[in-house]
């Protein structure tokens, strides 16, 4: 399980974002190796954004992140999208329109600017 966080550096979430970036990179490389070997094994990195799970109810940091409406997806929807993507042979999938838009932004602007934007979002939306 990867995450949208794997697409960017996030201050105060650096270990989480870095570990998810590893999962994205590893999954894409492994997917390519499996295809080249004609193994029949499919590897898909599922990169959801905010997902309604118990992790969101009880974050480890002891703080609660206020998520803008429309940004939270159900775990069921995320899982269904991931399963369909895997069977379709996609090596990476980002469920949700807002999340896809976020990945586009991360490729259009400098990493420095993206880090500032998402760092500011986290600082301003933590209770």
Residue ranges and their predicted role:
Residues 6-8:
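Conserved catalytic-site region of short-chain dehydrogenase/reductase
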Residues 117-127:
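Short linear elements at protein peripheries
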Residues 16, 24:
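Catalytic tyrosine of NAD(P)H-dependent dehydrogenase/reductases that use a Tyr as the general acid/base
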Residues 10-14:
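Active-site loop immediately N-terminal to the catalytic Tyr-X3-Lys motif
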Residues 3:
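Residue(s) in the substrate-gating loop at a strand-loop-helix junction
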Residues 33-98, 108, 112, 116:
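SDR active-site lid
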Residues 27-33:
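Alpha-helical segments that scaffold the active site and NAD(P)H-binding pocket
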